[in-house]
Amino acid sequence: MSRYRGPRFKKIRRLGALPGLTNKRPRAGSDLRNQSRSGKRSQYRIRLEEKQKLRFHYGITERQLLKYVRIARKAKGSTGQVLLQLLEMRLDNILFRLGMAPTIPGARQLVNHRHILVNGRIVDIPSYRCKPQDTIMARDEQKSIALIQNSLDLSPREELPKHLTLNPFPYKGLVNQIIDSKWVGLKINELLVVEYYSRQT
């Protein structure tokens, strides 16, 4: 299944706020109306919708998400927590959380167009897994700096998660540590996602 490129508001109306996909918010009560129209949701549908929230928020394909679930299963610790850490430490998501891009698709464009340096080197892979002590900044080019400056000027001043630090001049981000689950940027029940895949395999 390919990456979603359809109407974004349609997704947030059904699944709730997906800040990585769009900074628009569903109208108050719209999700409740949708639920009442569709009647009682089955356990399968509840798990499916949690999985879809994860996919659309982080802007990944079904195949990519399944790959992350398999990696998380093999790691030490809670599979759900490890899964969220893997997704949160992607370069495109880190740029979004720093405010250097308005959405994760916007961050992916920055990376694909070679505007971003990690530890002084161009990285053009949005799924690049960031590590503690990685530094992330714009290339020393006017267009790259202008794109990030524009995003920072327009983004709401929200508290940065504790695993990140942003120096606004010269637009340099630092990964301090692996993210703690309470700082994940999405309201999600990751255990339902793990359950969804455990029943598919």
Swiss-Prot record:
Tagged with keyword Transmembrane helix: no
Subcellular location: Plastid, Chloroplast
UniProt-listed SUPFAM superfamilies: Alpha-L RNA-binding motif
GO annotation (BP), single: ribosomal small subunit biogenesis
Gene3D superfamilies (UniProt xref): Ribosomal Protein S4 Delta 41, Chain A, domain 1, RNA-binding S4 domain
GO MF entries: rRNA binding; structural constituent of ribosome
Pfam family membership, one: S4
Superkingdom field: Eukaryota
GO CC terms: chloroplast; small ribosomal subunit
Keywords: Chloroplast, Plastid, Ribonucleoprotein, Ribosomal protein, RNA-binding, rRNA-binding
Domain S4 RNA-binding: 89-149
InterPro entries, sorted: Ribosomal_uS4, Ribosomal_uS4_bac-type, Ribosomal_uS4_CS, Ribosomal_uS4_N, S4_RNA-bd, S4_RNA-bd_sf
Renumbered residue ranges of the record's region Disordered: 15-43
Function: Component of the chloroplast ribosome (chloro-ribosome), a dedicated translation machinery responsible for the synthesis of chloroplast genome-encoded proteins, including proteins of the transcription and translation machinery and components of the photosynthetic apparatus.
Similarity-based family: Belongs to the universal ribosomal protein uS4 family.
Quaternary data: Component of the chloroplast small ribosomal subunit (SSU). Mature 70S chloroplast ribosomes of higher plants consist of a small (30S) and a large (50S) subunit. The 30S small subunit contains 1 molecule of ribosomal RNA (16S rRNA) and 24 different proteins. The 50S large subunit contains 3 rRNA molecules (23S, 5S and 4.5S rRNA) and 33 different proteins.
HAMAP family reported in the protein's UniProt record: Ribosomal_uS4_B
Name of this protein: Small ribosomal subunit protein uS4c
Gene name of the record: rps4
